[in-house]
Amino acid sequence: MDVNPTLLFLKVPAQNAISTTFPYTGDPPYSHGTGTGYTMDTVNRTHQYSEKGKWTTNTETGAPQLNPIDGPLPEDNEPSGYAQTDCVLEAMAFLEESHPGIFENSCLETMEVVQQTRVDKLTQGRQTYDWTLNRNQPAATALANTIEVFRSNGLTANESGRLIDFLKDVMESMDKEEIEITTHFQRKRRVRDNMTKKMVTQRTIGKKKQRVNKRSYLIRALTLNTMTKDAERGKLKRRAIATPGMQIRGFVYFVETLARSICEKLEQSGLPVGGNEKKAKLANVVRKMMTNSQDTELSFTITGDNTKWNENQNPRMFLAMITYITKNQPEWFRNILSIAPIMFSNKMARLGKGYMFESKRMKLRTQIPAEMLASIDLKYFNESTRKKIEKIRPLLIDGTASLSPGMMMGMFNMLSTVLGVSILNLGQKKYTKTTYWWDGLQSSDDFALIVNAPNHEGIQAGVDRFYRTCKLVGINMSKKKSYINKTGTFEFTSFFYRYGFVANFSMELPSFGVSGINESADMSIGVTVIKNNMINNDLGPATAQMALQLFIKDYRYTYRCHRGDTQIQTRRSFELKKLWEQTQSKAGLLVSDGGPNLYNIRNLHIPEVCLKWELMDEDYQGRLCNPLNPFVSHKEIESVNNAVVMPAHGPAKSMEYDAVATTHSWIPKRNRSILNTSQRGILEDEQMYQKCCNLFEKFFPSSSYRRPVGISSMVEAMVSRARIDARIDFESGRIKKEEFSEIMKICSTIEELRRQK
C-alpha cells in the first residue's frame, strides 16, 4: 500500500515536524588532507576584523601583534573586534550590582579549587599539542613529557602533585635562557629478512637530546596547534579548531572554573547545565517576560546569531574582566588567573601539516611543510591560496602565525558567556531608564533576546540599543541571521520553544544503532538510548517499540547472531544452531548467542544478563559469567560504564549504561601496525605508565587509596607501604621470618638504587 507522506503530518502541529528538516541522517562530512588552509583563513579573518588596531612587536619572540582594544568605535553591520575596556568594566560593575557578592563568592570557591586541584586534572581531554615533539599527543602523554623535561631542567615544584605547583614550574621555565628536551626520531635501514630473503626496511626509534633557546621555547609554549573540525553537519566549508599545549591548559582551567562558578549563579546563562535542567532554566526566563507583558506590553523574541564570536573576542578584554572580578582578592590569586589571557594575547597558531602537491604527469607527490610557506615561490599555488599566503607572511615565525586578537574555538566558553550575560543584564528597566526592557539567554556564542515594550517602535528601539551595546564589548549580532518573532516561538542552542520546548528528535538520530564496542556493551547502550529518548525526547511507546525491533535486527546483522531456529546462513550459524539444540531453556540464551529478544519498552532498564538469568541453563550461566574464562580480558567490573554517543551536533556526549561483565565484554587488542612507526617510542612510554600505575594500585587497593599528600614519590610511598604491610603480616604470623627479612632487603635495595640514580 502506498502511503502519502503528507498524511503523516495532518495531525502533527507544524512546529513538531521541524525535526524532519534537519540534516542529521547519514554520515556526517569528515575532512581530509591538511587544515593549513582553514587555519590561515582564521588568522587572516581575525586580523581583518581588528585591522584598525595598533601594531606592536613582542620583545621576547619578535612576533608582530595587533591590538584592537579601545580602537575606533565600531561601524554598523561590519563585524569588528574593537571592544572598549571601560564599557566592559562598566558592564561587569552593573552585573555585580544586580547580583550582590557574586564575584566575591565565586572567587572564594575557585580559590579552594585552585589549592586542591591535582596535576592529573590535565590528563583529561583528548589530543593535546605536545611542545616537546611539536605535534599532537594524548593528554596524559603530553603532560608526562612536559613534566619529564621540566624535571631534567631542574624544575621540581611539580613533584608535590598540585596543579598550582606545576604552574609555578611553567612560569619559571619561561625565564630560563635555554631548555633541554628529548625528542624522538627514527632511523631507517635496509636489511635482508632471514626468513624470506627479501630486503626490508627496518625502522629504529632513537631519542636525542636537543637544546632550545628562550625564544624558541616561548614560541612553543604559546603555540596552539590547529586541526580541522570534523563531522560538522549543515556546513559547506570546514573550519579550524585549536588544541593548546600543556603550558596554557592549567591556567585556562582555573579561569574557566571561576567563570563556571559565576555562570551557575546567573539565571540567563545556558552553561554549565544541560538537558532538562537547561530547559527548565530557559522556560523560567520566558515565563517571567510573558507574565509581565500580558496586558499592556508587546513581547518579542530574537533567535540570535553572532557573527564570528571567537574571532572578535579579545584576550585583553578577558584580562580586564578578570582584573575586575578578582579586585579585592589576594595577589597570588589575581596573578594566577591573569596569566591565561596574557598568554592568549601572545599566542601563536601552528599552521598544521602544510600543503601536498602532486604532479599528475610524473606521478610525484611532495609535501610542503608549513615552515616553508614563508619563503617558497608562490607561483606553484592557485590564486586563492596565493592571496592567503601573501596576507599571512608578515605574521609567520617558524611555521607558526602570530595571532594576538581573537580567541580560537572553545577555549573560554564560560567566561565569554559571562560577558554576554552582562549585556543581557543591562536590559532591566532601572538601566534602560525608558519604556522598553529586555532579558534573554546566553550560552557561549548562542543567544535568545526577549524584548518587551508598549509598542512596536519601543521594541525596535530596544533591539537597536541591545545591538549597539553589544558592539561596544566586541559582540557582533548578525542582522542577517537573527530573526524576531512574537515571544513564545524561538530557538536556542537547538532547543525549539513553542509555548514550551518541543522535542527535536532528529538530533538524537545518530545515536540510535549499534555502537561497535562489543556485544555486551552494544546491547546495553542500544536499549539505554531508547529508554533515555522516551524520558527526555517525547519518543512515544509505539515508536519506541518499533525502534527496539529495528535495533535488535540491526544488532543481529552486525554480530551475525540470528536466532538459532532461523533460516539465515552466516559464518556463525553453524555454532549458534549447535548451541540452540543443546540448550534446554532457549529463552535464557542471550541475543548475541542466538537467543530470542525478551526486551520490551517496560524492561529497558534491566541489563540483558539479569533479565534472562533465571531462564538460563546452569552450565550456560557458568560459561557466561566465569571470570577465569581465558577469552575475556576483564576490566575491573564497574556497575556503570560510560559510552560516548554522538548527538547530531555539539560534542560527543557521555552516557551511562549498566555494565554486567560476561564473556561477551571483550576488549579488542591494539592494532599492531603502530609498532613499526615513529609512534612506537610513545607507545612504550604509555605502557610504562600503565605498568607503574597498576603496580601502584597493587600497593594501595582502592579502599585505602587516598591521594598522596606531601612530596613523597610513588616509589617512596610503595616502599614505605610494603614495610608497614610486611611488619603487620609478620607480627600476626601470616608470613615467616625469612620472607619478612627478604622483603626488608628488597626495600633497602630499591632505596639504595634511587640514591645512586
Swiss-Prot record:
Biased composition annotated in UniProt, kind: Polar residues: 55-64
Compartment annotation: Host nucleus; Host cytoplasm
UniProt short sequence motif Nuclear localization signal, positions renumbered to this chain: 187-195, 203-216
Catalysed reactions, as listed in the record: RNA(n) + a ribonucleoside 5'-triphosphate = RNA(n+1) + diphosphate
Gene Ontology biological process terms from the UniProt entry: DNA-templated transcription; symbiont-mediated suppression of host gene expression; symbiont-mediated suppression of host mRNA transcription via inhibition of RNA polymerase II activity; viral RNA genome replication; viral transcription
Main subcellular location: host cell
Region annotation Disordered: where it falls in the sequence: 50-82
EC assignment: 2.7.7.48
Lineage top rank: taxon: Viruses
Alphabetic keyword roster: Eukaryotic host gene expression shutoff by virus, Eukaryotic host transcription shutoff by virus, Host cytoplasm, Host gene expression shutoff by virus, Host nucleus, Host-virus interaction, Inhibition of host RNA polymerase II by virus, Nucleotide-binding, Nucleotidyltransferase, Phosphoprotein, RNA-directed RNA polymerase, Transferase, Viral RNA replication, Viral transcription
GO MF term set: nucleotide binding; RNA binding; RNA-directed RNA polymerase activity
Residues in RdRp catalytic domain copies: 286-483
Post-translational modification: Phosphorylated by host PRKCA.
Record region (Promoter-binding site): 249-256
Cellular component, GO, one term: host cell nucleus
Subunit structure: Influenza RNA polymerase is composed of three subunits: PB1, PB2 and PA. Interacts (via N-terminus) with PA (via C-terminus). Interacts (via C-terminus) with PB2 (via N-terminus); this interaction is essential for transcription initiation.
Role played: RNA-dependent RNA polymerase which is responsible for replication and transcription of virus RNA segments. The transcription of viral mRNAs occurs by a unique mechanism called cap-snatching. 5' methylated caps of cellular mRNAs are cleaved after 10-13 nucleotides by PA. In turn, these short capped RNAs are used as primers by PB1 for transcription of viral mRNAs. During virus replication, PB1 initiates RNA synthesis and copy vRNA into complementary RNA (cRNA) which in turn serves as a template for the production of more vRNAs.
Family affiliation: Belongs to the influenza viruses polymerase PB1 family.
Protein name, per record: RNA-directed RNA polymerase catalytic subunit
Species: Influenza A virus (strain A/Memphis/4/1980 H3N2)
